[in-house]
C-alpha cells in the first residue's frame, strides 16, 4: 500500500513539474517559440499553438516536421507535448494533405545556457568582431563546430544603450555586418551588445559579445610599402582609416626577419623604431604593422617588403 501511494505521489509531482514549465515559454520572434528547459533531462511541457485568427472556423490539421499526427491533431488552437529536446516545426493545413496555412517553430534552450556545443570557443570567445575605423561599421564572425556544421542562424540582435543597431547576415551564415550611427569624434559612453541565436535541429543556443568600438578597431594593412635607395622603407596610411590622421594617429611596429620566414616568426632579427636599415634587404624581410596610437587597440595584419 505504501509503495502504491509513493508511486502515485511521484506521478503527481512529475505532472506538476511538467506543468510548471509553462512559464518558460518565450516568443523569440514571429513564428518562433523558445522553450527553456532545465539542464537535467526528463522534461515534458505542454505548448499551446494557434494556427491564426483567420482560420477560427476552418477544419485545421497539424503536422510536425512535415509528418501528420496519429491520431490526427485538429483545431485552430491545440496543445502539443514537447519532451526533452524534441522540438520542431509545427505546421497547420486545411486538410491532412491540404494547403499550408501557418507554422510555429518550437526550439529548445537549456537553462542555464552554459553547455554550448554549436560554436567553437577560440581565443577571445565564440564571437570575434573587428572594425576598420570609427565610422560605426563593424563585422563579427564565428565558426561552427564540426559536429554542428549544419547549424543555422535564427536571429541576430545588436544594440547600444537600448538603441537597435541594424545588421545583415553574411551569405554563408558565419558572420554579420552591422552599422552603428556613431560620430567618429564622440567618446563612447556605452558598450555595444551583440547576441546571435543559432540552432542545430531543435536545439537553440544564444551567444553574446559586448564591446566598445574602440576595442575592436583594427587598421587595414598598410598600403604602398616600398623601398627607396636600398635602405629606406616608406608606406601610407590605409585608405579606410579615419581622417585627419593628426587626430586619428597610428603608431607602428617594425620588424626584420630572415628571408623565407613569416612576419609572425619568433625568429626576428630586431624590432626597431626608425625606418632606415643598414643591412642588405634581399636577405631579410621588412615587416610593419599599425595600431591606434591612443586607444592601442588590435594591431593590423603585417605588411611586408623585401
Name each model-derived stretch.
Residues 14-30, 108-121, 210-220:
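Proline/serine/threonine-rich low-complexity linkers at boundaries of modular beta-sandwich domains
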Residues 64-76, 167-177, 262-272:
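Short beta-strand segments within Ig-like beta-sandwich modules, predominantly Fibronectin type-III
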Residues 1-35, 52-63, 89-91, 98:
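N-terminal Sec-dependent signal peptide, specifically the hydrophobic helical h-region
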Residues 53-64, 138, 149-159, 245-260:
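Solvent-exposed loop segments of extracellular immunoglobulin-like
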Amino acid at each position: 500500500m505504501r509503495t502504491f501511494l509513493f508511486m502515485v505521489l511521484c506521478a503527481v509531482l512529475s505532472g506538476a513539474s511538467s506543468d510548471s514549465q509553462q512559464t518558460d515559454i518565450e516568443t523569440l520572434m514571429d513564428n518562433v517559440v523558445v522553450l527553456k528547459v532545465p539542464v537535467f533531462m526528463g522534461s515534458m511541457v505542454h505548448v499551446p499553438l494557434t494556427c491564426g485568427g483567420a482560420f477560427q472556423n476552418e477544419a485545421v490539421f497539424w503536422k510536425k516536421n512535415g509528418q501528420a499526427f496519429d491520431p490526427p491533431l485538429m483545431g485552430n488552437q491545440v496543445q502539443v507535448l514537447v519532451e526533452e529536446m524534441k522540438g520542431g516545426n509545427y505546421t497547420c493545413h486545411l486538410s491532412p494533405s491540404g494547403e499550408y496555412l501557418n507554422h510555429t517553430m518550437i526550439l529548445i534552450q537549456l537553462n542555464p545556457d552554459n553547455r554550448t556545443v554549436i560554436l567553437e570557443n577560440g581565443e577571445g570567445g565564440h564571437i570575434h568582431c573587428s572594425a576598420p575605423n570609427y565610422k560605426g561599421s563593424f563585422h563579427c564572425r564565428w565558426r561552427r563546430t564540426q559536429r554542428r556544421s549544419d547549424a543555422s542562424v535564427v536571429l541576430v540582435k545588436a544594440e547600444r544603450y537600448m538603441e537597435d543597431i541594424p545588421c545583415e547576415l553574411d551569405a554563408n551564415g558565419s558572420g554579420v555586418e552591422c552599422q552603428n550611427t556613431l560620430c567618429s569624434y564622440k567618446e563612447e559612453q556605452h558598450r555595444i551588445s551583440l547576441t546571435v541565436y543559432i540552432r542545430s535541429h531543435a536545439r537553440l543556443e544564444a551567444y553574446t559579445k559586448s564591446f566598445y568600438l574602440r576595442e575592436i578597431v583594427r587598421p587595414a594593412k598598410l598600403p604602398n610599402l616600398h623601398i627607396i635607395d636600398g635602405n629606406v622603407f616608406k608606406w601610407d596610411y590605409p585608405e579606410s582609416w579615419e581622417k585627419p590622421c593628426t587626430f586619428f594617429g597610428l603608431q607602428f611596429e617594425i620588424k626584420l626577419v630572415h628571408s623565407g620566414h613569416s612576419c609572425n616568426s619568433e625568429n626576428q632579427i630586431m624590432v626597431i623604431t626608425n625606418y632606415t636599415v643598414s643591412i642588405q634587404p634581399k636577405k631579410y624581410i621588412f615587416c610593419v604593422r599599425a595600431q591606434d596610437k591612443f586607444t592601442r587597440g588590435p594591431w593590423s595584419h603585417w605588411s611586408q617588403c623585401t
